[in-house]
């Protein structure tokens, strides 16, 4: 009997569903826009009823409740996304599909996928896109006590050239996400990020903020590498700008385990597939435990 694994990337703008064979090769994939919880969850249930799998890995936007002893385990909790606050995502899926579901954050899933693809068991994954999130793995396991990390909302030093910008985070204003996520570019300049020229000074400002997040991760978690994904990182030369800022900020305080080019890097899984691969392996971990 063939074994198949499912992946759900539950994003704030789109859901990506995928099926893999027992060797983690994608055999089917389906994307659709994230709309209302009812419509979006119904589409997901329909897909997996038509494409049966043994277990599902689910990486979701958040915040989410990962505390297994909590009454709201499996919920999307205090999200700013309209209509999605306090939605029992896992509960609805499990009731309809009756299969094991491994629930974690979207960035944790990406971190896990990168770990499996590279063999590196101590890493941090930061995604810089519509929002900012971070996942970390130490010795092959996710970090976190009763919940998950919220690296996107860490406090950072403001760039001296834009002290008047209040930030866009609805909770904290000028946290990392508030000043460095994709929408902050348009809020500051009035221009969509993808239309801003590569030599605009705004990219130096963004790299200054993202490099601070990399410094914080380095000094608190001591990973083997930091992986930067998300739409903002698709800008040409963005990674090199961040690497230069990082080296300047670190100021030779500690030795890195490798060159900065290998230490701060882009994802190794092609076509934004880190989370999908991670979800497959997380589903596998549940299936083999059953």
Curated annotation (Swiss-Prot):
Modulation of this protein's activity = Inactivated by EDTA. Inhibition by zinc ions (Potential).
Domain of life, source organism:
Bacteria
Going by the UniProt record, its keywords in alphabetical order are: ATP-binding, Carbohydrate metabolism, Kinase, Magnesium, Metal-binding, Nucleotide-binding, Transferase, Zinc
Reaction catalyzed: D-fructose + ATP = D-fructose 6-phosphate + ADP + H(+)
Cystine residue pairs: none
Keyword Transmembrane attributed = no
Instruction: Tell me its EC number(s), please.
Output: 2.7.1.4
Provide the top EC class: transferase
The UniProt GO MF terms for this protein read:
ATP binding; fructokinase activity; metal ion binding
Question: Which Pfam families does its entry note?
Answer: ROK
Q: Where does Zn(2+) bind?
A: 153, 169, 172, 175
In this chain, ATP is annotated as bound at 130, 183, 231-235
InterPro entries per record: ATPase_NBD, Carb_Metab_Reg_Kinase/Isom, ROK, ScrK
Q: Which cofactor does it need?
A: Mg(2+)
What family, per the record? Belongs to the ROK (NagC/XylR) family.
Summary of subunit composition and partner proteins: Homodimer.
Quote the protein name from its UniProt record.
Fructokinase
